[in-house]
Amino acid sequence: MKNKILNNIFMSLVLICTLLLTACVDQYQGEKNKKTDIGEKRIIVTSVAVAQITDLLDLDLVGVTDTTSFKLPKRYENVQRVGMPMGPDIEIIRSLKPTEVLSPSSLKSYLEEQFKQAKIPYRFVNMSSVGAMYDSIDEIAKEYGKEDKSAKLREEYESLLKEYEQKRKDKKKPKVLILMGLPGSFVVATNNSYVGNLTELAGGENVIHDDNEEFLPVNTEELVKLNPDIILRTSHTMSEEVMEEFDEEFKTNDIWKHFDAVKNNKVYNLDNNYFGMTATMGYKEGLKKLDEIFYKEQ
């Protein structure tokens, strides 16, 4: 158990460094196999979020990620597992002879070189925001002849956006600080992060803006000057442990007592099933939750 926790902490720290040093906001495509008929496509997916997309597009898989925290779509329950998202088993993937491996672009720095060396055809799927996710859905649908399904998904998405724009047009935007927790540490989510994007879609104003980065190191002395109305706390992994660490941080670090959000009991813990590192189709539930938090008193 101890080794598992230490391993999670190590992987989380590596992820922080990656997110702070690189901006994975584009799609990338590796060496592709010669085009075959759609029925011969052999697709592997290395994250649950991407598996949600392929499920909605009615695509079969020959390989899918392992997961301990999130639930795979039912149609993939008996599909060959290929290892965890940040460390897939390259030999298993090669043995399945994929025509394409789909991975989230946030893991590009971990996986691209491995895929290249193994001569595995790949595509990195941009899921840095809800809009980017739908653009990716359109591209995948075009590749596999599922445009009818992506068009319906796009229509539902645009209708939902209009609904939220209408709901919040006469309401005051709350100033929001978003903290993303990992075992042993936490970072601040900017407007470029998925959680930051979701906050803005729900009508909140993220107090932390950056032109490039999704996450930034925490500087509480600077954050207190921004004096957010609301503080949101979520996690990348190990949610229960991370939330306990957040509680300890807020109890023992006196600076948090100077935030109006803390004084007014406006600190909220979020479910990382809907508020994680990358966009997922669970964003609709996320919007509902944020709407309750932001506007329940208006």
Give the label of every model feature segment.
Residues 41-42, 134-144, 151, 155, ...:
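Structured C-terminal subdomain patch of bacterial secreted/periplasmic proteins
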Residues 68-71, 187-215:
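Alpha-helical, coiled-coil/dimerization segments enriched in small aliphatic residues
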Residues 36-57, 149-202:
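Basic- and aromatic-lined ligand-binding clefts that recognize polyanionic substrates
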Residues 2-13:
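Bacterial N-terminal signal peptides that target proteins for export
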Residues 90-103, 120, 220-233:
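Proline-aspartate-enriched helix->loop->beta-strand connector
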Residues 21-23:
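C-terminal motif of bacterial Sec signal peptides marking the signal peptidase cleavage site
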Residues 45-96, 100-105:
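A short, structured surface patch at a secondary-structure boundary
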Residues 25-27:
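Bacterial signal peptide processing site
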